[in-house]
Amino acid sequence: MLEYKYMNSDSMNLKEKKEFGDKARVAREKLSLTQTDVAKKANMTVNYYAMIERGEANLSFEKMKSIVKVLKLKITIS
């Protein structure tokens, strides 16, 4: 299981967005899921999910939780 450490703040900085996107991509590939699979299960568009993987999207904590659940990631909040 991959782990992502979320720093509790109002918004993620560019480095944090990229780190989360990279972890999401690795986890998705390990589960043999497509971006479309994850997007549908997490209730978001494929384009938005692709932006998350590239570290380009502003990501709410609720959306992050949806992705974490689909990808079976562990999240630590500090």
Label the model's feature ranges.
Residues 32-51:
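Short alpha-helical DNA-recognition segment
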Residues 48, 58, 77:
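Residues in the helix-turn-helix
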